[in-house]
Design a protein with these regions (language model features):
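Single-stranded RNA-binding regions, centering on S1/OB-family and related RNA-binding modules
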Residues: 1-183
Length: 183
């Protein structure tokens, strides 16, 4: 669809937005691929339920099962403007950018070798994810020598782990089984 010809007002509005600008509006629809937001100062979208759009990863730093666990239709939100999606004529927003990054604070006070208590959140072919703090998950890789075939864990199991690597840039936490305990 040629958005310029279809809606000059919409195109002018989107073209006026600046990277990092904070936009407010109301959640109008929640889909499996993201959330539509009717922006306070924006015109209506000719096709979609809102000019603002938040992709699933930009909703929160924390793990969630569905977007409806983070926002609700009718809820007021404010998000940082990330980009103008020229294909869909949408303002891409981030709620996550408006929240403190829990990994940053965690990484500041965590050192390699630190023992942590956590619980198993996900089992994947390459290892086990363990939540060690609110919004913080680490991976015990299947190549970890302390993770043997005899170790059978289920989602929700409590475990003791040791921090083996913290990558602040990639926001990655690598863990190992605690040598004195059981996974």
């Amino acid at each position: 669809m040629d958005w310029r010809a279809e809606s000059a007002e919409l195109w002018a509005f989107l073209g006026s937005l600046r990277l990092g600008e904070i936009l407010s509006g109301t959640v109008t629809a929640i889909e499996s691929f993201g959330v539509f937001v009717a922006l306070d100062d924006g015109p209506p979208h000719p096709l979609y339920p809102g000019v603002g759009f938040i992709t699933i990863p930009e909703l929160s730093w924390r793990r969630f099962e569905a977007a409806s666990g983070v926002v609700q239709v009718g809820q007021r939100v404010s998000g940082e403007f990330l980009q103008f999606d020229t294909w869909n004529a949408e303002a891409r927003l981030s709620l996550r950018a408006m929240q403190p990054d829990p990994f940053r604070a965690f990484a500041e006070c965590t050192t390699v070798g630190r023992e942590l208590h956590g619980h198993v959140t996900k089992l994947v072919p390459f290892g086990v994810f363990v939540q060690v703090a609110d919004g913080i998950e680490g991976l015990i890789h299947r190549r970890d020598p302390t993770l043997t075939p005899d170790d059978v864990v289920q989602i929700g199991d409590d475990v003791m782990v040791v921090v083996t690597h913290v990558d602040r840039e990639k926001r990655q936490l690598l863990l190992s089984r605690q040598t004195t305990g059981q996974l």
